A protein has these predicted regions:
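Metal-cofactor-binding active-site regions of metalloenzymes
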Residues: 1-191, 197-204, 208-217, 223-334
């Protein structure tokens, strides 16, 4: 089954580019940019990856990205992820980036996105991996900061497919950013928001995503299973849920395999993703393999999860059909 998963054509819809910063690249960029790291070796840095909840992860996550300074740093970061994705048979990815985490350090929005874009173009031509970008607002910053970031994005609108909301959820509900997301919709962006697992007021947040914001997708969203009405709405609207099993194991000490199976049984379009693979030490294949080996998911369930990702991706219908046909042909021949 591992071999079957390894070569299965995949889409990834929930991966934070800053979360793909491998320790080796972190040290390389720190040397280049004269940034002093808290850790002397890669091994020491890996030992520090001792996350037990969302805030403990975010503390290390934001500190680590201080090594990203120049356009070429963002190119290298993105290229390294896309090279790995190609090796794991990811044909298509929608990637988050956190511009406020960089502009707040004095790195220009254009510096960030131009570096990422160069890697996207190279990956399309050299690796056969197609990608789109999702701009994520940091929910623990102000709505005013998010609105300014939205305005900064407009000259690069043709490079961005949608907007999302991530970072520390406590005290930062979706409605805090209702006006920002309304404006983003007017500019033609697709909408998604993180509703992380087991967060305070999570059911209220999911409800706000559905009924106040009107999202096209929900990132994580596992706790929706606690409310049959939310489940029914998500299923009826055909909304994607971008679940991240190995990430969940770090943050809530569970792969949430049983929950993923239940979503599938309820007709909810759950997908599997890596989230921050450099930190959780698991890319797409490792996430799917963990679900199969430890969670007991069947071959049919794995195929359904992978198909769901293409089905809810922000693609035109002809490209979607082409990707789904590749999955179908692979499954039939294996």
């Amino acid at each position: 089954m591992n071999d079957f998963i390894a070569q299965l054509p995949k889409a990834e819809l929930h991966v934070h580019l800053e979360g793909t910063l491998e320790p080796e690249l972190s040290f390389e960029l720190a040397r280049k940019n004269g940034v002093e790291l808290e850790y002397a070796t890669v091994e020491e840095l890996l030992k520090a990856y001792d996350f037990h909840d969302l805030p403990s992860f975010l503390r290390i996550y934001y500190k680590a990205m201080e090594v990203l300074r120049e356009e070429d740093d963002f190119f290298q970061l993105t290229w390294q992820y896309l090279t790995k994705a190609a090796q794991q048979r990811v044909l298509y990815a929608e990637m988050f980036f956190d511009p406020q985490a960089h502009t707040s350090r004095g790195v220009a929005f254009g510096t960030v996105i131009r570096g990422i874009r160069r890697a996207q173009e190279r990956a399309a031509s050299q690796l056969g991996v197609d990608t789109q970008l999702i701009l994520c607002f940091l929910r623990d910053m102000s709505a005013e900061s998010a609105m300014l970031t939205l305005e900064e994005s407009l000259p690069f609108k043709h490079w961005i497919v949608g907007v999302g909301l991530d970072s520390d959820e406590k005290g930062n509900p979706p409605v805090k950013f209702a006006e920002v997301f309304r404006k983003a919709r007017q500019h033609g962006y697709r909408l998604t928001m993180h509703c992380d697992v087991n967060q305070e007021n999570t059911l209220v947040h999911i409800d706000q995503c559905l009924h106040t914001i009107g999202v096209d997708r929900i990132d994580h969203g596992v706790n929706s299973l606690e409310d049959p009405a939310l489940c029914a709405t998500i299923a009826e609207r055909g909304l994607g849920l971008t679940v991240c099993p190995v990430s969940n194991r770090f943050v809530v000490q569970s792969l949430t395999a049983a929950e993923i199976r239940r979503m599938l049984a309820l007709g909810m379009r759950a997908t599997v993703n890596s989230d921050d693979p450099a930190y959780f030490r698991a890319y797409m294949n490792e996430n799917l393999q963990a679900l199969q080996e430890e969670g007991g998911l069947t071959r049919d369930e794995i195929v359904q999860l992978v198909s769901n990702a293409f089905a809810v991706a922000w693609l035109d219908e002809s490209r979607r059909a082409s990707y789904l046909e590749k999955v179908k042909r692979y499954v039939e021949s294996h």
